[in-house]
């Protein structure tokens, strides 16, 4: 009779080992939750971070316009923290997927800006895994799923400027550079080419970001100003607070009454749940609209155009603010990629 003792023990040992590993990955008691999405997130974010830092410091100049005039973005090539950036992939690459094995060598890959695609794609998928990990952790704790829904706003905004816009424009060289001055350059060129300031979805995004900041400051100041005193007058309010206590720490009715009389009654919330839903939804929806706007402008469905739209009874043009902005747009348009342009045909 065949002896199956050792085989059975091996299966049991393997099962025990993988059971331990899976239990560790999915444990909600760990100081840092990992989860199934964490298996994807941690290496992707780590690779993107290491590659970004290395490229920001050491990467050689990149032929961003595809005309053999490389642009330097690394610190070792004379840049500082403000002017430095990871330069987008070359216009010669277009929207082709450009991993290192597609180049003739590592030097060519660097020259054509392969690091930009490497950092961006690892970051996008890593951030997507982070969002999935937020849902997974909330699910295991029995929480509602709205945390990952809120995080979807910055994720879709990142996808819009790093992935959708380059695809719509036909080249990753049109993506947003990974640096401070590069970001501002991207914004100016975007305005010049798409008139984003006159796009309704951008206006909604501005309202979402600035409105969210205003509402957050208002909420924080109201809560801090209406804390319930559990101590004597000569002691700090913090002394009477215990972390995790079930009792309320501030009086929402007092805050509601104050703000309702400061503005008007219906400008204030008397329900904590509706208040915090509003605080979350306002900026998230605004940023969703901005991402949608950038994604539509990626395919040249641009902002509204009111240039030369006002004339007097004699048919003479009366310049408006739209015409002034248009003149600024023309100036920015001819200044960027100036060696790749054939002025003035580029403005036709």
UniProtKB/Swiss-Prot annotation:
GO CC terms in record: chloroplast thylakoid membrane; photosystem II
UniProt: Fe cation binding residues: 219, 276
EC number of the protein: 1.10.3.9
Entry binding sites for [CaMn4O5] cluster: 174, 193, 336-337, 346, 348
Cross-referenced SUPFAM superfamilies: Bacterial photosystem II reaction centre, L and M subunits (SSF81483)
Site-annotated residues for Stabilizes free radical intermediate: 194
Note describing how the cofactor binds: The D1/D2 heterodimer binds P680, chlorophylls that are the primary electron donor of PSII, and subsequent electron acceptors. It shares a non-heme iron and each subunit binds pheophytin, quinone, additional chlorophylls, carotenoids and lipids. D1 provides most of the ligands for the Mn4-Ca-O5 cluster of the oxygen-evolving complex (OEC). There is also a Cl(-1) ion associated with D1 and D2, which is required for oxygen evolution. The PSII complex binds additional chlorophylls, carotenoids and specific lipids.
Site feature location: Tyrosine radical intermediate: 165
Entry superkingdom: Eukaryota
Record PTM: Tyr-165 forms a radical intermediate that is referred to as redox-active TyrZ, YZ or Y-Z.
Location in or out of the cell: Plastid, Chloroplast thylakoid membrane
PROSITE patterns attached to this UniProt entry: REACTION_CENTER
Record's catalysed reaction(s): 2 a plastoquinone + 4 hnu + 2 H2O = 2 a plastoquinol + O2
Residues annotated as binding a quinone: 219, 268-269
Record-annotated membrane-spanning stretches: 33-50, 122-137, 146-160, 201-222, 278-292
Protein keywords: Calcium, Chlorophyll, Chloroplast, Chromophore, Electron transport, Herbicide resistance, Iron, Magnesium, Manganese, Membrane, Metal-binding, Oxidoreductase, Photosynthesis, Photosystem II, Plastid, Thylakoid, Transmembrane, Transmembrane helix, Transport
Binding site for pheophytin a: 130
Keyword Electron transport: yes
Topology in the lipid bilayer: Multi-pass membrane protein
Protein task: Photosystem II (PSII) is a light-driven water:plastoquinone oxidoreductase that uses light energy to abstract electrons from H(2)O, generating O(2) and a proton gradient subsequently used for ATP formation. It consists of a core antenna complex that captures photons, and an electron transfer chain that converts photonic excitation into a charge separation. The D1/D2 (PsbA/PsbD) reaction center heterodimer binds P680, the primary electron donor of PSII as well as several subsequent electron acceptors.
Miscellaneous comment in the UniProt entry for this protein: 2 of the reaction center chlorophylls (ChlD1 and ChlD2) are entirely coordinated by water. Herbicides such as atrazine, BNT, diuron or ioxynil bind in the Q(B) binding site and block subsequent electron transfer.
Family statement drawn from the similarity comment of this UniProt entry: Belongs to the reaction center PufL/M/PsbA/D family.
Subunit record text: PSII is composed of 1 copy each of membrane proteins PsbA, PsbB, PsbC, PsbD, PsbE, PsbF, PsbH, PsbI, PsbJ, PsbK, PsbL, PsbM, PsbT, PsbX, PsbY, PsbZ, Psb30/Ycf12, at least 3 peripheral proteins of the oxygen-evolving complex and a large number of cofactors. It forms dimeric complexes.
NCBIfam families noted in UniProt: psbA (TIGR01151)
Protein name: Photosystem II protein D1
Provenance organism: Heterocapsa rotundata
Lineage: Eukaryota, Sar, Alveolata, Dinophyceae, Peridiniales
């Amino acid at each position: 009779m065949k002896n199956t003792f050792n085989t059975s023990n091996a299966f049991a040992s393997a099962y025990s080992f993988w059971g331990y590993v899976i239990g560790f990955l999915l444990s909600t008691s760990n100081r840092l939750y990992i989860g199934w999405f964490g298996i994807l997130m941690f290496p992707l974010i780590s690779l993107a971070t290491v590659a970004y830092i290395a490229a920001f410091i050491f990467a050689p100049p990149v032929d961003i316009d595809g005309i053999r005039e490389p642009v330097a973005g690394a610190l070792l090539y004379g840049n500082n923290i403000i002017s430095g950036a990871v330069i987008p992939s070359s216009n010669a690459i277009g929207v082709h997927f450009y991993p290192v094995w597609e180049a003739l060598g590592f030097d060519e890959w660097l020259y054509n800006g392969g690091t930009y695609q490497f950092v961006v794609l690892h970051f996008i998928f890593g951030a997507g895994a982070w969002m999935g990990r937020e849902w997974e952790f909330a699910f295991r704790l029995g929480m509602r799923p709205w945390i990952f829904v809120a995080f979807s706003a910055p994720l879709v905004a990142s996808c819009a400027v790093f992935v959708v816009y380059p695809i719509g424009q036909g080249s990753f060289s049109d993506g947003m550079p990974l640096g401070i001055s590069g970001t501002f350059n991207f914004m100016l060129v975007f305005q010049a080419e798409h008139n984003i300031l006159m796009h309704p979805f951008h206006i909604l995004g501005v309202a979402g970001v600035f409105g969210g900041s205003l509402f957050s400051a208002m909420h924080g100041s109201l809560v801090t100003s209406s804390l319930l005193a559990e101590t004597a007058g000569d002691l700090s309010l913090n002394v009477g607070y215990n972390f995790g206590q079930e009792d309320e720490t501030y009086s929402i009715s007092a805050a509601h009454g104050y703000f309702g009389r400061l503005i008007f009654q219906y400008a204030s919330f008397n329900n904590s749940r509706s208040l915090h839903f509003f605080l979350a939804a306002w900026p998230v929806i605004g940023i969703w609209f901005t991402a949608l706007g950038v994604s539509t402008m990626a395919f040249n469905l641009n902002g509204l155009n009111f240039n030369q739209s006002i004339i007097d009874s004699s048919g003479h043009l009366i310049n408006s603010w739209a015409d002034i902005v248009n003149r600024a747009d023309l100036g920015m348009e001819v200044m960027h990629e100036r060696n790749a342009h054939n002025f003035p045909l580029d403005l036709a």
